Amino acid sequence: MAMTAEVKDELSRLVVTQVSSRRAEVASLLRFAGGLHIVSGRVVVEAEVDQGSIARRLRKDIFDLYGYNAVVHVLSAGGIRKTTRYVVRVAKDGEALARQTGLLDLRGRPVRGLPAQVVGGSVADAEAAWRGAFLAHGSLTEPGRSSALEVSCPGPEAALALVGAARRLGVSAKAREVRGSDRVVVRDGEAIGALLTRMGAQDTRLTWEERRMRREVRATANRLANFDDANLRRSARAAVAAAARVERALEILGDTVPDHLAAAGKLRVEHRQASLEELGRLADPVMTKDAVAGRIRRLLSMADRKAKTEGIPDTESAVTPELLEEA
């Protein structure tokens, strides 16, 4: 099941006992999935959704909360309609329902955003508003570079109201107009997870987070694999160059090299692939990596000074293109 369908399936089965939250969900669902129509001079309320469980939930809530009977019409897939759709319609008491849910104001004019009682309601009402909006026109993409939780909105006012509701929940959401359609988008992974939990889709959040973590691990592994060969080549060349310079330094200094510098140099030559930290552990007594690096620097510096004085090739002369090619 796609992530969007999983979220909607879980939300449609969520048990909500608080009346104000149930009212906020119904109002939001009707606002984002529906519309008001005038049929034979009467106001008809309609909401079109993509799952039968959502339609049944809405019909039940309308009856439980307002006492009105809603009819569910099934629009089977076919022609330009790719999937089966469900239309919840209240005809006989449409105007009364529209007024009670806040779709119409006191003067009988359509409300363009979310109803005032939802906007000014509790945090639980804000959660319910998001739940209703997502059940109506929400989508959740698989975790990835362009993962997003989106809700298509009936207009900019409704989009801004939904952004405000998200802000009350501590979630950053943005209103966007995409190809003439108003949308509210949440892109941050942590914010998406938090919003799923707030809406009541905790199980789906866990699934989404698991897939997100797996994808991040794979992406990290791919990045490491892409750079691994280059890093290994660079490391190998650096090790070969360092060992060659140290060998040349020991040749230049001969018996005049101080014992402690000679010991550090021999460690570098004998353990070409070891890190400075590993060389420090191999030393007797044990040294820090900074101490090892310092002794090797002094060894090379001493040898280069002597080479310059005597007019002979210095330690850099040991690092030839042929040597690096072989690394």
UniProtKB/Swiss-Prot annotation:
HAMAP family cross-referenced by the UniProt entry: HTH_type_WhiA
Signal peptide limits: none
Source organism per UniProt: Mycobacteroides abscessus (strain ATCC 19977 / DSM 44196 / CCUG 20993 / CIP 104536 / JCM 13569 / NCTC 13031 / TMC 1543 / L948)
Entry's transmembrane regions: none
Family: Belongs to the WhiA family.
UniProt KW keywords: Cell cycle, Cell division, DNA-binding
Taxonomy, superkingdom: Bacteria
Molecular-function annotations in GO: DNA binding
Region called Disordered, residue ranges: 307-327
Function: Involved in cell division and chromosome segregation.
Any one of the GO BP annotations: cell division
Protein name as catalogued: Probable cell division protein WhiA
DNA-binding region: 275-308
